UniProtKB/Swiss-Prot annotation:
Induction: Expressed in the late phase of the viral replicative cycle. It comes from the Viruses. This is Transmembrane protein C257L. Keywords: Host membrane, Late protein, Membrane, Transmembrane, Transmembrane helix, Virion. It is a multi-pass membrane protein. GO terms for cellular component: host cell membrane; membrane; virion component. It is found in: Host membrane; Virion. Belongs to the asfivirus C257R family. The chain crosses the membrane at residues 123-143, 163-183.
Length: 257
């Protein structure tokens, strides 16, 4: 029974013939047709194309996806006739197929497509290679294999230049959101601090006017009629009768009446 990796490695082993017939390629001499096993790469490339069309607003989106599904089905039938097993197209995606490749130098399983891995050059010439992780081949010459093998292969799908714009937009939105929250909270704290300071100033002002304010000895409010009450005895001293005024002001009866 064949596994997905068996099929992938089998296809990679003769991938140099997938561009045939092509008179410019020396390996294509006498080859009139690309091997059916190249269907593995066709499916992988179609899966990439399908992924891109899924997230487009193009009016032809539904029509294009339908055609891609039909093409994938044709290649899946071809592979079934060769290997006698039903392969899921979802298993034949570039980032999943990378798990099946082997490092030429060490024999260890390779995590990423790079020139040092099995037949990557042929795949690039055929246009089948996936978009490399950010940094491209430079990353693979600058970092040791042990480091490279720690990079999850799934990152090849998301950490590529074509997709990074979406992640940068999301990151920018997150940063702006955090900045907005910080600014809003700072302004709220300043507003509360300002209100608190105003309350303190008002309390100090009231305290200066009445030292017993807000205590059990708080002074009675000033009498608005005190001025007139002070004038009445003065008029009475001159012999006037101020009984009516005393009554209106709530004062006891006085002389001269």
């Amino acid at each position: 029974m064949y596994s997905v990796c068996d099929v992938v490695r089998d296809a990679v082993a003769q991938s140099h013939l997938c561009a045939c017939p092509n008179d410019k390629l020396p390996q294509c001499k006498g080859v009139t047709k690309a091997p059916p096993k190249c269907s593995v790469f066709h499916v992988a490339k179609l899966q990439d194309t399908k992924f891109k069309w899924k997230y487009t607003l193009d009016p032809l989106k539904a029509q294009k996806l339908s055609q891609i599904d039909k093409d994938i089905e044709k290649d899946a039938i071809t592979l079934k006739l060769i290997y006698g097993i039903e392969l899921s197209p979802e298993d034949l995606e570039w980032w999943k197929m990378q798990r099946c490749l082997i490092n030429k130098k060490t024999g260890a399983k390779g995590g990423q497509f790079a020139n040092k891995y099995l037949e990557r050059q042929d795949l690039e010439l055929l246009g089948y290679s996936p978009t490399p992780i950010i940094g491209g081949d430079f990353m693979f010459t600058a970092l040791p294999d042990k480091v490279l093998r720690t990079i999850p292969v799934a990152w090849d799908r998301f950490l590529n230049p074509a997709m990074m714009i979406f992640f940068l937009i999301i990151l920018l939105c997150v940063i702006l959101g955090i900045f907005y929250v910080l600014v809003r909270n700072t302004l709220r704290r300043k507003q509360k601090s300002k209100q608190h300071q105003m309350e303190i100033k008002r309390f100090i002002k009231e305290k200066e006017q009445d030292p017993y304010i807000h205590t059990s000895f708080e002074s009675w409010p000033a009498d608005p009629n005190k001025k007139w009450k002070d004038l009445i005895p003065m008029y009475e001293a001159q012999g006037y009768c101020m009984a009516d005024y005393r009554k209106k002001l709530g004062m006891p009866p006085g002389p001269n009446c």
